[in-house]
Amino acid sequence: MGSRRITLLGALFAVLAVAIEGRTLLTHNLKAEAAETVDAVSSVVAGSAGRQLLVSEPHDYNYEKVGFDWTGGVCVNTGTSKQSPINIETDSLAEESERLGTADDTSRLALKGLLSSSYQLTSEVAINLEQDMQFSFNAPDEDLPQLTIGGVVHTFKPVQIHFHHFASEHAIDGQLYPLEAHMVMASQNDGSDQLAVIGIMYKYGEEDPFLKRLQETAQSNGEAGDKNVELNSFSINVARDLLPESDLTYYGYDGSLTTPGCDERVKWHVFKEARTVSVAQLKVFSEVTLAAHPEATVTNNRVIQPLNGRKVYEYKGEPNDKYNYVQHGFDWRDNGLDSCAGDVQSPIDIVTSTLQAGSSRSDVSSVNLMTLNTDAFTLTGNTVNIGQGMQINFGDPPAGDLPVIRIGTRDVTFRPLQVHWHFFLSEHTVDGVHYPLEAHIVMKDNDNLGDSAGQLAVIGIMYKYGDADPFITDMQKRVSDKIASGAITYGQSGVSLNNPDDPFNVNIKNNFLPSELGYAGYDGSLTTPPCSEIVKWHVFLEPRTVSVEQMEVFADVTLNSNPGATVTTNRMIQPLEGRTVYGYNGAAA
């Protein structure tokens, strides 16, 4: 009986794959064919041992019994003009500006906290292990998404996520995807019943790390068919677990709920870029559905609804909203970022034989490290971003003289703000050679800390393979221990690594600076978007050492925080464009 069940499920996958790979809408006839296949599957599975049926009431609607649309009064709004889902035709999209001032006047969705790696949905997470695997949660109250509708700003709070499987609800240019997730958000404005839904498509490919974690956690805490299964210690980060990896372009339109009563009070946001899902993960959805509803089909999508004259608007993602090295490539010039295509860009190749004496640089002096190069300059109150780059955000600096650089006629005092790493390939090269690791200590004009265009100075530290770096060892162990204990999670920002009676402090001299302080200095830019050309670079030429094991930890943190990312985080070398690179403290040729 088990083999027959597998054969029939395979037949269903084949039917659905024909529709999806053929880039055609799933028609009523094809749906009927799929339904017949599932009828056979359901009759076989009905006697399966060990299957837990739903003990409480199922949905009062069912895709198999009522059909793939809601007729006969089940959907109170059937026949009205703004129903969902729809087929999104990308060659007939309207620009977002055309939506403003119209009857459906709606702004771009401000994702706000949903883009943050620290925005965690963790409180009272519960999942419904029946058809659609809906799970609910309490979202944070701060930094919520916003839409301006008819001149009124609405703040939206995420309330639940569910899935439509084996055939997506929306189609894009006639193509149905094998899975579509819907995150439902409710307006927090008094008296408003407005909803906003984010739709995420999945295409066949590698397993999705979040779905893997969700399904495994759910299965370990309950049985298929159970309702309100609590997922203890389960966290959801929307940026990492749900949103597309790189392109945040979405299609927006006015529509409805896709299940009874199909209320027309939804602002839809269907994202263009698809995530991936494996066949094995889709099989879990089928098992859950059949356990909860033995008479049901494993597809739970409503048929495409007529557009009825509505416009669908394209909201192009800002390239620097969420950048990712594997998705955007190793440069930002080809991603519509004009600010990354200037003539004073970083990183560069430092050719030591052509370094000019620092004394010949008339408008910029050497950096006077002052107390930064002492045992006494210890930064406390530091926090860490557990993600790509492993950034340490420095607390307030101790009393004492901060580093000084004379720029033009002004002595500029710089405050250290943070340090982060670029790994497996350094960003700068020295005589054409990449190092495995490069740290960047970012400092800002202390008199203009609030100015986004304020002068920056960055100290670059190279690492070569060798002995483990003691400071990196301590940092990585603290991260690993706290993740293992559940105190923090991958992708979180601003976490403390302090232990009782053992604070996580940073001393620049002992933890970062090499013993020889010769460095190359030049005018450049940030190496990540927006690539602002406001940086005085100081790349120290004597490397520290890092072990292979430490590099592996950087890779693990990156992949756990950014599924789909590459473990290299370097921008490609930029042209010098006539700039002079200077040598200081004996580094000149």
UniProtKB/Swiss-Prot annotation:
Q: Where does Zn(2+) bind?
A: H420, H422, H440
Q: What induces it?
A: By salt stress.
Pfam families named among the record's database cross-references: Carb_anhydrase
- Give the EC number(s) under which this enzyme is classified: 4.2.1.1
Q: Which GO terms describe its molecular function?
A: carbonate dehydratase activity; zinc ion binding
Q: Which InterPro entries match?
A: Alpha_CA_prokaryot-like, CA_dom, CA_dom_sf, Carbonic_anhydrase_a-class, Carbonic_anhydrase_a-class_CS
Positions of the region Catalytic?
Answer: 390-589
Which PROSITE patterns does the UniProt record give? ALPHA_CA_1, ALPHA_CA_2
Cofactor requirements of the protein: Zn(2+)
Superkingdom, natural source: Eukaryota
Question: Which family does the UniProt entry place this protein in?
Answer: Belongs to the alpha-carbonic anhydrase family.
Q: What is this protein called?
A: Carbonic anhydrase
The primary gene name is DCA
